[in-house]
Structure formats: structure tokens, C-alpha cells
Amino acid sequence: MLQPKKTKYDKRHKGRIKGNATRGTKLCFGKYGLKSLDPGWITDRQIESARVAATRYMKRQGQLWLNIFPDKPVTKKPQEVRMGKGKGVRDHWVSVVKPGRVLIEVDGVDLLMGKEALRLASQKLPVRTKFIIKNA
């Protein structure tokens, strides 16, 4: 799974997702992409699942880029533990996504294959997405 090699602090505040994305809103590497329409947290497992779904469909053709990285730790307390006594231990990592952010890019495949690969990837993600084409 994706996670940072080293972090300055173990735990982070939950935070709020306000507004639209200002960075990463245009295609940089590929010809086709998947853009988020909703705000949300995407876990490391969901990112990996989307990547596997898209690459399996493309069958080693073309290239795929992940434009998001899970850099926010999410903590969880054990089951049946009373409230208080500090924050729980780090459970998994998430990527905070705002609307308008390009999540995945694909190149080196035709339009139909790229669209279907990204559709399969989008089914693994917890946010609504749309298919975008470079210069269209």
C-alpha cells in the first residue's frame, strides 16, 4: 500500500474540506484522465484497487499515472474501548481530495480503452468522477 516513508508527526487533525481544488486540475502527463466531482478522503487501499483495475484492463498497454498520494494518517481506537485516554493509534493513510482534482491519468491507448479503464477505476473510488480528455 502507498504511505509516506517518514513523517514529522504521527497524528493529524481531521480537518475540513472546503472549496474546489486549485492545484492538479489539468492533465499533465496523459491524454485521458479522471477528475473528481466531490470532496472526500481516498484511502491507500482504494487507490491501489483503482490502479489494479485500470492496469488489468489495459493489459500492459499504455501508461498510467496516479496524481494523488495518501499522506494523511487516520487513527482508530480499539473496539469496545471507553472514550478519552488519548487519540488512537494510526490505522491507515488517506489522500484528501477536493472537487476538480485530477486523480488518474492514462496515455498510450485508444479512446475506448482509456475510457473503459478509467470507468473501472472510478468504480473503486468513493467520490464521483468524470472522464476528461486533453485539449477538449
From Swiss-Prot:
UniProt xrefs under CDD domains: Ribosomal_L16_L10e
Source organism, top-level taxon: Bacteria
GO cellular component terms attached to this protein's record: cytosolic large ribosomal subunit
BP-aspect Gene Ontology terms: translation
InterPro entries registered for this protein in UniProt: Ribosomal_uL16, Ribosomal_uL16_bact-type, Ribosomal_uL16_CS, Ribosomal_uL16_dom, Ribosomal_uL16_sf
The UniProt record lists the keyword Iron: no
Alphabetical keyword list: Ribonucleoprotein, Ribosomal protein, RNA-binding, rRNA-binding, tRNA-binding
Molecular functions (GO terms): rRNA binding; structural constituent of ribosome; tRNA binding
Pfam families per UniProt: Ribosomal_L16
Keyword Amino-acid biosynthesis on entry: no
Job description of the protein: Binds 23S rRNA and is also seen to make contacts with the A and possibly P site tRNAs.
Subunit architecture: Part of the 50S ribosomal subunit.
NCBIfam families to which the protein is assigned, alphabetical: rplP_bact
Family of the protein in this entry: Belongs to the universal ribosomal protein uL16 family.
Listed name of the protein: Large ribosomal subunit protein uL16
Organism: Karelsulcia muelleri (strain GWSS) (Sulcia muelleri)
Name of the encoding gene: rplP
